[in-house]
Amino acid sequence: RHMDMSMKGNLKGRHSIDDAQVLNLPNQHGSPAQLRVVPETMDMKMTMLGAMYAPNDEITFLAMAMQHETSMRLNTYGAMSRTLLGSFTSRSEGLGDTTLGALLAGGDVTQKYLNGTWHYGLALSIPTGSIQQTGRVLTPMNQQISGKRLPYPMQLGSGTYDFKPSLTFNSAAHGEWRYGGQVSGVVRLDDNSQGYRLGDKTNVQGWVSRRLAAFASASIRLDASYQDQLRGADSAITLPVPTAQTDFTGGELANLSVGFNFVGQHGIWAGHRLALEWTSAIHQKANGVQMEFQDTLTLGYQKAW
């Protein structure tokens, strides 16, 4: 599965703000006293390779590895003024965190208006992604510096072991229609080696799909999530930019997605599945100032034996 996510501009709470408003905000690192670097755009590409194995109908084991590629474009302003000194791009790339877990059958539901099956998931995220990514930055003193520790969103992993439980319901077919829902979470089990932990996360989502043909279906999905603020701090992340402020982390996010799913039926195509989904943010309430989510495009391929 491959995902391409874009962000553009900045929000304070629910409202868009410009560079001039960001420059009025205090810098928790002290020098300079106010923020002087403002993110403009961010593009994150994630490629996930997963495998699942079901020895019986009651349990399915899963494993997933992830490759990250992130780039962020930023403007730098003078330390003693609001003069625009220039722009620069930060990049990070490498292996993300690895997930191992299992899906366990929970049984059937046969109510009048709720007919289907549910299962629960238990997974552990292993901190294989780097949290010490560095890059070249333009400082408010108008200096190009290499080897500077990049802010939290540019790191490749959480640095912690994370517990990832989930509960999922999938309906039986109602004519051409199906529906489902899921509640899931991420619980950080400890602080990482750099002295912080990302916020715990809760997600709720629901979907409806309709069969278009024997091999194709379309779906609409709505998801909402809440993430706590980051706790602790990495003493090496000190750039006067919103993404380096620990109070400016976490918040609310809701997305609306439209997708198409194609499943091979016969011959060499049997067992092959191709999925395409476009996601757009419809609500975001950031803690402090954060970048504004835009769109995500996901392309997935699956082969079943």
Give the residues covered by each predicted segment:
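Outer membrane beta-barrel transmembrane domains
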Residues: 15-23, 27-29, 191-305
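Transmembrane beta-barrel architecture of outer-membrane proteins
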Residues: 32, 43-48, 95-101, 117, ...
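Outer-membrane pore/translocation modules
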Residues: 62, 66-193, 197, 243, ...
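Residues on the lipid-exposed face of transmembrane beta-strands in outer-membrane beta-barrel proteins
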Residues: 49-53, 63, 100-106, 122, ...
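A subset of solvent-exposed loop/turn segments in beta-rich extracellular surface proteins, enriched
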Residues: 1-101, 134-143, 228-235, 239-243, ...
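Transmembrane beta-barrel strands of outer-membrane/channel proteins
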Residues: 1-4, 63-67, 118-126, 181-185, ...
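Short loop/turn motifs that connect adjacent beta-strands in outer-membrane beta-barrel proteins
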Residues: 7-9, 58, 107-118, 131-133, ...
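Glycine- and aromatic-enriched membrane insertion/assembly motifs of diderm outer-membrane
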Residues: 34, 38-70, 174-203, 211-218, ...
